[in-house]
């Protein structure tokens, strides 16, 4: 299912090479610091999310985050579910859960030109417009507190 999602045009556009991403997601199943979820709506899987400690894999644009901060990466894999508001709903719940577990802040870093994701994250409660450079190009650092 995740392999199929990684091949949808919208996911490929932002996540890149499906084979590479599938290998990384599979490899991360054995990584205790990487938490992964399949997100469902009415018992139908539609999205993938992962969360990890911000400083576990050092990235310069996350270096200033407080110790214990969490980072989320996510995508909607079912094209029919895009634009329905489900992304913002599960991201808000996930961010609140990570805060309740002790993270002082939860970060997400959509590509600068991924306007759909940026709107969804803002509706979920993430704030921030700081443009940062990442290994994948310019992104916007958004925080949930």
Task: Give, region by region, the residue ranges found by the protein language model.
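Acetyl-CoA-dependent GNAT
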Residues: 23-81, 97
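Conserved acetyl-CoA-binding loop-helix of GNAT-fold acetyltransferases
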Residues: 77, 83-100, 119-123
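Conserved GNAT acetyl-CoA-binding A-motif
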Residues: 98-110
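A structural microfeature
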Residues: 47, 130-133
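Conserved acetyl-CoA-binding loop of GNAT-fold acetyltransferases
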Residues: 122-131
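A short, well-structured alpha-helix characteristic of acyl/acetyltransferase catalytic modules
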Residues: 1-26
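Conserved beta-strand-loop-alpha-helix junction that forms the acyl-donor binding cleft
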Residues: 108-118, 134-138, 144-145
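Structural motif
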Residues: 67-69, 105, 139
């Amino acid at each position: 299912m995740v392999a199929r999602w990684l091949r949808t045009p919208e996911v490929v556009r932002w996540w890149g090479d499906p084979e590479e991403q599938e290998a990384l997601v599979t490899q991360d199943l054995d990584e205790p610091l990487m938490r992964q979820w399949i997100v469902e709506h009415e018992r139908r899987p539609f999205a993938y999310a992962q969360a990890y400690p911000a400083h576990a894999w050092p990235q310069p644009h996350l270096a200033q985050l407080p110790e214990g901060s969490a980072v989320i990466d996510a995508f909607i894999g079912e094209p029919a579910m895009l634009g329905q508001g489900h992304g913002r709903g599960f991201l808000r719940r996930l961010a609140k859960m990570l805060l309740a577990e002790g993270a002082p802040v939860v970060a997400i870093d959509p590509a600068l030109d991924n306007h759909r994701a940026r709107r969804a994250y803002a509706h979920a409660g993430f704030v921030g417009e700081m443009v940062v450079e990442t290994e994948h190009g310019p992104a916007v650092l958004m925080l949930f507190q």
